[in-house]
């Protein structure tokens, strides 16, 4: 997809701090980190999200990359979180499948903020 920023990063058309790459995926530091370690794992082929007929081999490559990133950054020893937002209501802002790998601090117990009584 020619206007997709993650496609451009995967194709080395725009600069990024790449921390892992293989034939199927690229992993790079998030430009707006939400934790001391915040890496995005992205397939090189464009898929809108995790339910976009993604081949099992690509998902396996993504999970493998998560493990490599966790090990290489040391968050495999302290704990980390993996998130794949799917759709606008879930907070997906770039519609190219990606996994967030977050760690390097105490991320707390909850996955999302508790709803307020007004919600």
Question: Model-found features: residue ranges?
Answer:
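HIT superfamily nucleotide-processing domains
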Residues: 1-119
